[in-house]
Amino acid sequence: MIIWLAELLQPHFSFFRLFEYLSFRAIASILTALCLSLWMGPRLIERLQMLQIGQVVRNDGPESHFSKRGTPTMGGVMILAAIIITVLMWADLSNPYVWAVLVVLAGYGAVGFVDDYRKVVRKNTDGLIARWKYFWQSAIALVVAFALYAHGHDTAATQLVVPFFKDVMPQLGLLYIVLTYFVIVGTSNAVNLTDGLDGLAIMPTVMVAAGFAVIAWATGNVNFASYLHIPYIPYTSELVVVCTAIVGAGLGFLWFNTYPAQVFMGDVGSLALGGALGVIAVLVRQELVLVIMGGVFVMETLSVILQVGSYKLRGQRIFRMAPIHHHYELKGWPEPRVIVRFWIISMVLVLVGLATLKVR
């Protein structure tokens, strides 16, 4: 929105040329989203407390979690609001990739909101029925996948980029739709599984978003894309503003979500943020790098799959409890230790993911 205003006023006031620079808008994006989150946080928490919208805690979970019962949840609303407002302010709204991320963010946020609402307001512990949750997740992902394929099929935008191999970039064809679907839905649910401790999900999300901001900038710059042997996709440069908005909103939320948490993001936040990271990975053609940078999310998801599979096949559990962060809690690790160590792992994996751009 502001970039349109700048283009209108630039002939009369040269100062407005500043608003057209991507670097300036990226910095403005992170600061705007951060300030919005910090401003909305206390007001939202107070409102959630008044409405008695508190966290539901499993009776079979770690005993340390019983004290979290009643802590305000659905705080993801402020994350999404901060991101959407910031993107509408600072991004180029003529860019279709920006709208692709916003559609997934808002759509998955709506699914998560209904799920949270049924759990904490209607007191239905099951929330949104699983098949309906996956139906709407799938529907949104497929709509976006088909739209993106129609927009960029048989171009660099539908190639598969394989880390460490600069000459391996096969054209996916219709498999692009399948890959896009699984990346968006899979990442959404992976972040949702990770969101079990104070600040555990939001900080890796911030780190991965920061990593994708760098990748989006390189992918959208013809010189750097050529130098790094990655596809040049012009529209991706504007995703830098989207990624920095996620970083700013996430850091603002962490101010209130850090241990001991004053608010939880709920499914409205985790499903939406995961879906957004998934579609960004697709747009910058780095789905495989997402597996590396989002290694904490992958680890949490695999722990659940292995736990369920082992119990059904052998009648035995591999972990004391899944997702794996609960396993370490039950081993006696204090919650802050689990959280910070997972943050460290995430930071290292994001750096490794960024290194794959050069190591080819």
Curated annotation (Swiss-Prot):
One biological process term in Gene Ontology: cell wall organization
Record key words, sorted: Cell cycle, Cell division, Cell inner membrane, Cell membrane, Cell shape, Cell wall biogenesis/degradation, Magnesium, Membrane, Metal-binding, Peptidoglycan synthesis, Transferase, Transmembrane, Transmembrane helix
EC number: 2.7.8.13
Pfam families: Glycos_transf_4, MraY_sig1
GO MF annotations in UniProt: metal ion binding; phospho-N-acetylmuramoyl-pentapeptide-transferase activity; UDP-N-acetylmuramoyl-L-alanyl-D-glutamyl-meso-2,6-diaminopimelyl-D-alanyl-D-alanine:undecaprenyl-phosphate transferase activity
Cofactor: Mg(2+)
PROSITE patterns: MRAY_1 (PS01347), MRAY_2 (PS01348)
Domain of life: Bacteria
Reactions catalysed: UDP-N-acetyl-alpha-D-muramoyl-L-alanyl-gamma-D-glutamyl-meso-2,6-diaminopimeloyl-D-alanyl-D-alanine + di-trans,octa-cis-undecaprenyl phosphate = di-trans,octa-cis-undecaprenyl diphospho-N-acetyl-alpha-D-muramoyl-L-alanyl-D-glutamyl-meso-2,6-diaminopimeloyl-D-alanyl-D-alanine + UMP
Localization annotation: Cell inner membrane
InterPro entries in alphabetical order: Glycosyl_transferase_4, PNAcMuramoyl-5peptid_Trfase, PNAcMuramoyl-5peptid_Trfase_CS
Residue ranges of the TM segments: 21-41, 73-93, 94-114, 132-152, 168-188, 199-219, 239-259, 263-283, 288-308, 338-358
One GO CC annotation: plasma membrane
Topology in membrane: Multi-pass membrane protein
Pathway(s): Cell wall biogenesis; peptidoglycan biosynthesis
PANTHER family documented for this protein: PHOSPHO-N-ACETYLMURAMOYL-PENTAPEPTIDE-TRANSFERASE, PHOSPHO-N-ACETYLMURAMOYL-PENTAPEPTIDE-TRANSFERASE HOMOLOG
Family: Belongs to the glycosyltransferase 4 family. MraY subfamily.
Entry function: Catalyzes the initial step of the lipid cycle reactions in the biosynthesis of the cell wall peptidoglycan: transfers peptidoglycan precursor phospho-MurNAc-pentapeptide from UDP-MurNAc-pentapeptide onto the lipid carrier undecaprenyl phosphate, yielding undecaprenyl-pyrophosphoryl-MurNAc-pentapeptide, known as lipid I.
Protein name as catalogued: Phospho-N-acetylmuramoyl-pentapeptide-transferase
Biological classification of the source: Bacteria, Pseudomonadati, Pseudomonadota, Gammaproteobacteria, Vibrionales
